[in-house]
Amino acid sequence: MKSSRSQQALPTSVRRALKKLGQDISAARRRRRLSVALMAERAFISRNTLARVEKGDAGVSMGIYASVLFVLGMADRLGDLADAASDQIGLSLEEERLPRRIRAARPKSSGAGHGT
């Protein structure tokens, strides 16, 4: 199977991470003694798609990866992938933008003295 241009453009570290994810999914399936056919059936995907998942194919939708992880009982960790509380880069950037000091707000004039 030929990989798309967008998949080839992925950074090496991302391709490695996807490959590891696929290998981990394959190992988890085998540890649970699930055949490829049964796993694919439970995830509502074809055996070919499951093979692509287990290879870490970047062209497979995130929803399919989520479905496979659900079948394995591992979907609960998906919510932590981009958890804002764990986003060290984002938190650092946010901290850099914080004001150095905060001044007390000036009281607003009541508008007295203006004719009504």
Regions found by a protein language model. Give the residues of each.
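A short, Lys/Arg-rich alpha-helix, primarily the initiator
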Residues: S6-R31
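Helix-turn-helix DNA-binding elements, focusing on the entry/boundary residues of the two helices
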Residues: I25, V36, R47, M62-Y65
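Short, charged recognition helix plus adjacent turn
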Residues: G79-T116
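Short, basic-rich loop-to-helix N-cap that marks the start of a DNA-contacting helix
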Residues: D57-F70
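Short alpha-helical DNA-recognition segment
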Residues: R33-A51
